Amino acid sequence: MNTRLEKFYKDNVVPALMKEFGYTNPMEVPKLVKVTLNMGVGEAATNKKILENAVADMAKISGQKPVVTKSRVSVASFKIRDGWPIGCKTTLRRAKMYEFLDRLINISLPRVRDFRGVSGRSFDGRGNFNMGVKEQIIFPEIDFDAVDAIRGMDIAITTTAKTDAEAKALLAAFKFPFRN
């Protein structure tokens, strides 16, 4: 079962990128590998209910149960110990990844207050894109009235692109709203 964005990739993005970068084989064209969502919840060290709410929010947003991340070292100034739960993360692949990106591009990002586009400089040099979201309430799955606290999250989009230019062209072909 192909999602709308996956079908768009095969029908429109692959031919456009083959022409733009001069690829001879469709398998050379960069593609999306995974989308990783990470939510750090520092307050979870003192109140376990906060982490449960964060896990529930991320499960609604991603459509799958996130993994609780634990601290690796004790930090006295943050009042956390080694092994304490301090966040959650999930990795989306295949159909869920395409569905999440479709919702992110077409529904969630336009709902951000004063949104002018995402920065085009957030690539890591190896063709992967990272961005942060300040509020989880931009996603339509989250009920605004049921939210206990506004939490942000990190979104990492991993591609097979070798360079940042290829990755940016790939995401721009998906109608990703870049500012520059």
Swiss-Prot record:
PROSITE patterns: RIBOSOMAL_L5. Keywords: Ribonucleoprotein, Ribosomal protein, RNA-binding, rRNA-binding, tRNA-binding. Pfam families: Ribosomal_L5, Ribosomal_L5_C. One of its GO terms (molecular function) is tRNA binding. One of its GO terms (biological process) is translation. The keyword Mitochondrion does not apply. It comes from the Bacteria. GO terms for cellular component: ribonucleoprotein complex; ribosome. The keyword rRNA-binding applies. Part of the 50S ribosomal subunit; part of the 5S rRNA/L5/L18/L25 subcomplex. Contacts the 5S rRNA and the P site tRNA. Forms a bridge to the 30S subunit in the 70S ribosome. This is one of the proteins that bind and probably mediate the attachment of the 5S RNA into the large ribosomal subunit, where it forms part of the central protuberance. In the 70S ribosome it contacts protein S13 of the 30S subunit (bridge B1b), connecting the 2 subunits; this bridge is implicated in subunit movement. Contacts the P site tRNA; the 5S rRNA and some of its associated proteins might help stabilize positioning of ribosome-bound tRNAs. Belongs to the universal ribosomal protein uL5 family. HAMAP family: Ribosomal_uL5_B. This is Large ribosomal subunit protein uL5. The gene is rplE.
